[in-house]
Design a protein with these regions (language model features):
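Short acidic-glycine-tyrosine-enriched beta hairpin
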Residues: 96-126
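N-terminal leader/capping segments at the start of a protein or of a new domain
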Residues: 1-36
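A short hydrophobic beta-strand segment most commonly corresponding to one strand
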Residues: 81-83, 134-149
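A short beta-loop-beta micro-motif enriched in histidine and acidic residues
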Residues: 54-58, 69-81, 106
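Short beta-strand His + acidic residue motifs that chelate non-heme Fe in jelly-roll/DSBH
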Residues: 71-74, 91-92, 121, 127-133
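Glycine- and acidic-residue-biased ligand/ion/polar-headgroup-sensing regions
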Residues: 78-97
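A short glycine-rich, His/Asp/Glu-containing loop-to-beta-strand
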Residues: 38-69
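Conserved double-stranded beta-helix
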Residues: 145-180
């Protein structure tokens, strides 16, 4: 049975250990039983970002992607762990171009995440996300900082020019809800 308070306590313990692997293991346990998790967070019926926990050293979000939804490239400036409990999330990773003549970033790989998959993102990672499915996808996103107010960047889809992060532009059509 997924217990949000215990999940947060386990994440805090992993943060205290300064172990990214321990964080990954906690998230893996959290998404290992999607039915139990869904009983706590609710069945995803529309795209949204729901805040499950927010603090200066830890933010936990329930992210529900619309069918075929794509985000702009963006960074977090903090480490993250993503755990899928429904559908799929395709991540494109980007790297800064050292001597840009046109674009400031370029593709540098990718990773498809499916049901039960968990991945770590380092604090300097730039990525964009696609839900390639014709149905909703859902994931728990854990950040080792105060994610919602952090100074971050995003890149314009057409020009790939860096600009200040605007959550509404990155997550178009995904309302932010406080689900605590």
């Amino acid at each position: 049975m997924f217990d949000l308070d215990q999940f947060i306590a386990d994440l805090r313990a992993a943060l205290a250990e300064r172990s990214r692997q321990a964080l990954k293991e906690v998230v893996a346990r959290g998404v290992s039983d999607p039915a139990s998790l869904l009983r706590r967070v609710g069945e995803p019926d529309q795209p949204a970002v729901r805040v499950l926990h927010q603090g200066p050293d830890l933010t936990v979000l329930n992210v529900v992607w619309a069918p075929k939804q794509v985000t702009l490239p963006h960074d977090h400036r903090m480490s993250a762990v993503i755990g899928m409990y429904g559908g799929r999330e395709d991540n494109t990773f980007w790297r800064r171009v050292s001597n840009p003549t046109k674009f400031q970033i370029e593709p540098a790989g990718g990773r498809a995440l499916g049901l039960g998959d968990v991945t770590l993102l380092g604090r300097d990672v730039i990525h964009s996300v696609l839900n390639p499915l014709t149905k909703i996808s859902a994931a728990i996103h854990v950040y080792d900082g105060e994610f919602l107010t952090a100074q971050r960047s995003m890149w314009d889809a057409e020009t790939l020019v860096e600009k200040p992060y605007d959550i509404s532009a990155v997550t178009t059509g995904m309302p932010l809800h406080d689900a605590r």
